[in-house]
Amino acid sequence: MSKRVQVIGAHSADFVWRAGGAVAKAVAAGGEAEVIALSYGERGESGELWKQEGQTIENVKRLRHAEAEAAAGHLGASFRSLDLGDYPLQIDGDALLQIADAIRAFAPDVLITHTDTD
C-alpha cells in the first residue's frame, strides 16, 4: 500500500535532515510526498547569502525556494512555502488556517513535523 507523506517544517531546509529518508522511502515504495515550509528561513538560516553585496530579501527567498524545490525533487516530492516570515515566525489564526487547509488538501497518511518543544 502506497502512502501519502506530508512534511511540514518551519524553514525550507528542515525537511532534508528531519525527514529526507522517510520521504525517499515512501516515494520509492510508490507513494506521494509533499513538503511544506512555513518560512524560507530568510533571516535566521541564510547567513552566507547575506554576505553577498546588494543582497535583497526577495532574492534570498527566491534562492531558498529553488534550493528546497530541487532537494524535494531529488527525493521525488513536491515543495511549496507558505512564506510566513522568519525572525519572528509567528503562527496566527490565518497561518493556522493555511496549515490546516494544506493538510486537508493533501490528506496525508503520514504527517511529519517538529516536536512541540522545537
Where are these regions (language model features)?
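Active-site rim/loop-helix segments in enzyme catalytic domains that contact anionic ligands
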Residues: 1-106
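Acidic beta-strand-to-loop metal/phosphate-binding motif
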Residues: 110-118
